[in-house]
From Swiss-Prot:
<dbReference type="Pfam" id="PF03167">
    <property type="entry name" value="UDG"/>
</dbReference>
<dbReference type="InterPro" id="IPR005122">
    <property type="entry name" value="Uracil-DNA_glycosylase-like"/>
</dbReference>
<dbReference type="InterPro" id="IPR002043">
    <property type="entry name" value="UDG_fam1"/>
</dbReference>
<dbReference type="GO" id="GO:0097510">
    <property type="term" value="P:base-excision repair, AP site formation via deaminated base removal"/>
</dbReference>
<comment type="similarity">
    <text>Belongs to the uracil-DNA glycosylase (UDG) superfamily. UNG family.</text>
</comment>
<feature type="active site" description="Proton acceptor">
    <location>
        <position position="72"/>
    </location>
</feature>
<dbReference type="GO" id="GO:0004844">
    <property type="term" value="F:uracil DNA N-glycosylase activity"/>
</dbReference>
<protein>
    <recommendedName>
        <fullName>Uracil-DNA glycosylase</fullName>
        <ecNumber>3.2.2.27</ecNumber>
    </recommendedName>
</protein>
<keyword id="KW-0378">Hydrolase</keyword>
<dbReference type="GO" id="GO:0005737">
    <property type="term" value="C:cytoplasm"/>
</dbReference>
<dbReference type="InterPro" id="IPR036895">
    <property type="entry name" value="Uracil-DNA_glycosylase-like_sf"/>
</dbReference>
<comment type="function">
    <text>Excises uracil residues from the DNA which can arise as a result of misincorporation of dUMP residues by DNA polymerase or due to deamination of cytosine.</text>
</comment>
<keyword id="KW-0234">DNA repair</keyword>
<keyword id="KW-0227">DNA damage</keyword>
<dbReference type="InterPro" id="IPR018085">
    <property type="entry name" value="Ura-DNA_Glyclase_AS"/>
</dbReference>
<keyword id="KW-0963">Cytoplasm</keyword>
Amino acid sequence: MIMADLERIKIEPSWKEVLKEEFTKPYFDSIRESYLQAKSSGAILYPPAPLLFNAFNLTPFDQVKAVILGQDPYHAPHQAMGLCFSVPKGVALPASLRNVYKELERDLGIPPAKHGDLTSWAKQGVFMLNAILSVEQGKAGSHQKFGWQTFTDAAISALSRKKKGVVFLLWGNFAREKRVLIDSTKHTILESAHPSPLAGNRYFGNGHFSKTNEILKVQGEREILWRLPE
């Protein structure tokens, strides 16, 4: 039972400290109850429970340099791994991720990776957060009323409040709505259309990968190696 109480929540220590008050609020109890009720009903939930907080565990609070925001996890088998847009090696690339790779190649000349595992980005300080952290198999958005967004909004607000110089990549209208949580006098906000094919070609040409590195370089920080290891 991954969310039984604060002591048993499997989340990276720096994030656990930053968000400790959230875990004690009534809404988090509601998330826990909704999640456990869905699980006990026999529904298949994604990502697997140990990966619910994967974005937090792979990118400690004090190491966050950039943020990519997604909406909710992939809802087909074997796809969701707790990082927005990312899928495990061996899983077919979703259409949105294929477009991310196309823009990466256009922007920086990096050929598309043969896999969709973005763990390397997360380990370099790219916080790859879905606003909603769980979903039922085959039912996109099925957990949007659980209260996850209150929790993930708190994470975004904490980054804005406690850090400076973070680059926020907001792709699509859903992500763009989160800009109200971000202090643009302390951080950089890069916006564009979503990489989904439904957005047409409006995502292409945003140059967000090179722009992120330019900003980090000016700030004296190590640039992100966007090329994924095979």
